[in-house]
Amino acid sequence: MLDAVIVGRVIQEYRESKGLSQEVVSGFADIGRTHLSAIERGVRKPTLETFFKLSEAMDIKPSELMKRIEAALKAP
């Protein structure tokens, strides 16, 4: 099972590495900024649809984002 905090952290770190704001990503993903904020803080888990929208908004393949999440879950 995925840890919501780790999922959120990976999404946030990737977004920030691309120099994208929450406003820009949430706008492209067609979700509220507060929803994205809750995902990044681990308060909410993204649905599969939202995960794909966020991936597209950040210009990363969903499979690549998932690999990053899996690596973070395995990290000590």
Question: For each of these PLM feature ranges, what is it?
Answer:
Residues 19-41:
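Short alpha-helical DNA-recognition segment
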Residues 11, 22, 33, 48-51:
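Helix-turn-helix DNA-binding elements, focusing on the entry/boundary residues of the two helices
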Residues 43-55:
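Short, basic-rich loop-to-helix N-cap that marks the start of a DNA-contacting helix
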Residues 56, 64-76:
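Short, charged recognition helix plus adjacent turn
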Residues 16, 27, 56:
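Alpha-helical residues within the helix-turn-helix
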Residues 1-17:
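A short, Lys/Arg-rich alpha-helix, primarily the initiator
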